[in-house]
UniProtKB/Swiss-Prot annotation:
Gene behind the chain: C
Effect of R196G: No effect on cleavage
Biased segments, Basic residues type: 178-205
Residue span of region Disordered: 165-212
Species, as recorded: Hepatitis B virus genotype D subtype ayw (isolate France/Tiollais/1979)
Function description: May regulate immune response to the intracellular capsid in acting as a T-cell tolerogen, by having an immunoregulatory effect which prevents destruction of infected cells by cytotoxic T-cells. This immune regulation may predispose to chronicity during perinatal infections and prevent severe liver injury during adult infections.
Annotated protein name in UniProt: External core antigen
Gene Ontology biological process terms from the UniProt entry: microtubule-dependent intracellular transport of viral material towards nucleus; symbiont entry into host cell; viral penetration into host nucleus
Ranges of the Sequence repeats in the UniProt entry: 184-190, 191-198, 199-206
Record PTM text: Phosphorylated. Cleaved by host furin.
Length: 212
């Protein structure tokens, strides 16, 4: 398996720090968190169950449909675009290597072990990474982090003391458990109309009438 890791490092041409984190940090057990610079952590992502994340194929289709022009552009758009570019490239290289191993590895048991490892371990990490950056581009990074915190609070709360349904990212601003810091906008409630004060002339006439 170490040889598999080494082949992946060699075949995955990753010129940026973000991609180096992806390849080296996860594979060699280095204490490198690819989400920290974006305000999140691997632990925060781990609160979401594995079946929460769409398949890599669906995520790649989503990224292509929404951000293809920006991803293919030679310009620097944002750190999320850069991370997506490198993740997509690394996934392509990983699939190429997995195909090569599947063709050239004669032992069926070893071949199945490699395929299972890629799908179970690397596949989940790529699904998490792709989902995170696509969601940050779609909903905003602060909203996504807020959602991860809210889901973490929800999942760790005993069922008897939490809402029946988990938070939903697309409706987070209305249903979030954890609100952004800062003053919340005050709602203006319609105040009852004040009775217009009577003019001095009117009050004087009334006082004269009362004296008569």
């Amino acid at each position: 398996m170490q040889l598999f890791h080494l082949c992946l490092i060699i075949s995955c041409s990753c010129p940026t720090v973000q991609a180096s984190k992806l390849c080296l940090g996860w594979l060699w057990g280095m204490d490198i968190d690819p989400y920290k610079e974006f305000g999140a952590t691997v632990e925060l992502l781990s609160f979401l169950p594995s079946d929460f994340f769409p398949s890599v194929r669906d995520l790649l289709d989503t990224a292509s449909a929404l951000y293809r022009e920006a991803l293919e552009s030679p310009e620097h758009c944002s750190p999320h675009h850069t991370a997506l570019r490198q993740a997509i490239l690394c996934w392509g290289e990983l699939m190429t290597l997995a195909t090569w191993v599947g063709v050239n590895l004669e032992d069926p048991a070893s071949r199945d072990l490699v395929v299972s490892y890629v799908n179970t371990n690397m596949g989940l990490k790529f699904r998490q990474l792709l989902w995170f950056h696509i969601s940050c581009l779609t909903f905003g990074r602060e909203t996504v982090i807020e959602y991860l915190v809210s889901f973490g609070v929800w999942i760790r709360t005993p069922p008897a003391y939490r809402p029946p349904n988990a938070p939903i990212l697309s409706t987070l601003p209305e249903t979030t458990v954890v609100r952004r810091r800062g003053r919340s906008p005050r709602r203006r409630t319609p105040s009852p109309r004040r009775r217009r004060s009577q003019s001095p002339r009117r009050r004087r006439s009334q006082s004269r009438e009362s004296q008569c």
